[in-house]
Amino acid sequence: MDIRSAGDVKIPVIIPRVDAQTAKEVEAKLNDLVSGGNRRIVCDFSQNDYISSAGLRVFLQMLKLMQKSGGKIVLCSLKPQVKEVFDMAGFSQLFRIFDTEEEAIKEL
């Protein structure tokens, strides 16, 4: 998973599939960002085509961790099929989701 920066905002580019096989890798990299003191994170889903319930759990854990640490995590560039999964799971109510990375960065 690549991670870019825009000022003090970290932008992890979420891998194409986040499922039971890959969720731990994604979680570890996101946890590294938070434990490294990053408090503004934009998760870029432009490369992601699929997320399972295991993947959703990773992002829910990250949201809770960021809220505890006084940080913010937002999502951007979700493809329609991925957005539908977030909608069906009720996660669209929990996360701020933006069409573009630029909009997401402005929110932080």
Task: Explain the meaning of each model-derived region.
Residues A20-L94:
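Amphipathic alpha-helical interaction surfaces in cytosolic regulatory modules
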Residues R96-T100:
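Short acidic-hydrophobic, aromatic-tinged amphipathic segments that line or gate anion-handling sites
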Residues D8, S46, E102:
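Conserved catalytic submotifs in the C-terminal HATPase_c
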